[in-house]
Amino acid sequence: MEYLTNLKTNIMDKQLGHREVSEGSTQPKPDPSGATMKACVWDGPLNVKIAEVPKPTITHPKDVIVKTTACTICSGSDSHIFSGEMPGIEKGAILGHESCGIVAEKGDEVNNLEIGDRVVIAFDLACGQCSFCKRHEYAACDTTNDSKLMDVNYGSHHSAIFGYTKLLGDVPGCQAEYIRVPFAEINCCKLPDDIPDSEGLFMSDVLCTSLHACTLGEVKKGDTVAIWGMGPIGLYAGRWAQILGASKVIGIEVVPERIELARQKFGFTVIDRNEVSDVPKKIMELVSNGVDCAIEASGFRFSTSILHKVERAVGLETDSPDMITECLNAVRKYGHVSIIADYVGTSNQFPIGHVVMKHLTIRSGQCPCQNYFGYVIDNIRSGKIDPRWMVTNKIKFDDLPDAYNKLFYKEDGYVKVYCDMTE
């Protein structure tokens, strides 16, 4: 079913053509010398490989080329792409959207960065000049994503995202030796000398996105917060909630190693799905009337009901609503639901009545990382946030294909990898 959806998406993308983008092209020019580089590329469902691809060079005067020093795998969207469940990808696409590195080349119109600067790269690509960017709504940038198909599917388009299918601009990803970064002045954050790569890398997505989850949920001092999914985003959403003053953080998880991590390192109350069948009921036992904020950080692939497992299997829906339904049942009246996980299509039996009858506020969407860089740096420096807590495995670049499998199948305790590209 995923194969047919992906094929249809790619055909429609070609038929519709592409919008003009302000960076000139979402595809970088190859180095005129013919130089190549290593990159991790998609090779069909449940397959990635390391391949030699053309090295990028400056394509637009606002570009920089970053020599990658570290990258990682997103256990959410990268896993969805790896499995073939995220439509709009073709063999050979460079994966990844989380990286940091050193500026190796820069365009003539880049004024706030110099060759040799250490930078972390926002996963969402903004131009800095459109009406959305001027409102600091960078993840909605109107000029970096060339997909007409996204306009057809959703009525408008998202910003481009590195390594994230044709619907998000088909921009080559960050799991590569070199990365072309358009509009570098807004999309690169210079890393201070006291923030090493092992910490700064995770500003590219996890630390900013998890903070954004709390912003969407309007978490404040004294709140009770429940989080579905104890992957990196869920874990750090809980940590940010603690920093913001939450009185209780409840995590919901099924993988034993993640349950242990949430309890021991983060100090959450954890509901183990292996032991509890009715999660909302258990939450109501822990918090009278329900939590102030429910954060969904697990994603569209996860179903608890036979109905939605069958509907997804036969193509009657693309996204299971089971986790969101649990959120709606577990949150208090007038509470907040924050959907930070990936949802891309349609769901059946969505309980819209809960939203109205319980007076709920639901907010969602990708993170505008650029808004959070300064605050995250301050909290890393103070020691309130330690990105190293999530890293379960340190790997080399050639180990990425194996790490994709381990993360997707949740094997050997994999939660988050740190891929050192300096060795």
From Swiss-Prot:
SUPFAM superfamilies on file: GroES-like, NAD(P)-binding Rossmann-fold domains
Class in the EC hierarchy, top level: oxidoreductase
Free-text cofactor note: Binds 2 Zn(2+) ions per subunit.
Domain of life the protein comes from: Eukaryota
Protein keywords: Golgi apparatus, Metal-binding, NAD, NADP, Oxidoreductase, Zinc
GO cellular component: Golgi apparatus
CDD domains: FDH_like_1
Cofactor: Zn(2+)
A Pfam family this chain is assigned to: ADH_zinc_N
Residues engaged in binding Zn(2+) 1: C74, H97
First-listed, main subcellular location of the protein, grouped into a coarse class: Golgi
Binding-site residues for Zn(2+) 2, renumbered to this chain: C127, C130, C133, C141
UniProt EC number: 1.-.-.-
Family: Belongs to the zinc-containing alcohol dehydrogenase family. Class-III subfamily.
Protein name: Zinc-type alcohol dehydrogenase-like protein C1198.01
